[in-house]
């Protein structure tokens, strides 16, 4: 694989990041990816500071390689975890669900490389101005929360708009897709769905089986009505949710939002892949083992 400024700057064997997937990206998966030569990432999610500290320290016992933390900026504990990553000596942070601007000075002073996930050129430019080391341009093919632009359209536009390195995400599962985004100007890739079936991934076997059995047309985007579109694998819940989403006369936004609460944990931890949310990207059908 080609060597780029990403792996060279971070001391990686490969310029491959593991996505900071909520309820999935724990110490076990992060350590596994880092030990294999990529950048493993722990998802802070809605963890408080001490919960994240525990996961970071657990990861340190499992690898002596560099690993990162993904911080969800809309978390009520974002302030706490923003301090914990500094205290624990984390060297790479990826961010999502908000603007990391208020924490940038603190992180940069600590020598942390901040790499925000961006769905648009405008946000990429803003992050460059604020001091980001790189940006992750994530297309709508990805699992979880998605933007409007595809990876093929977004990546070259971001590459042309900023001078910092661009990492491509969304719709990447094998070497052909990695080569393709490098041709678009990316310096690295972030992969999520492909890692869901890894032995180091601690999600339920039912969730893994759902990925392994997925067809090319099996993902769907829900949540557009609330302004938070999410890509997942079709199941009984997505069908019920979609029906409710289009029934605005009888289903309020609040009721719709409540329908989605706890669904990801239900699939990941309890193995309920019928009524839980099985987040996955459009490349799920390419994952066979």
Describe these PLM feature segments.
Residues 1-165:
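Active-site entrance/lid segments in N-terminal catalytic domains of soluble metabolic enzymes
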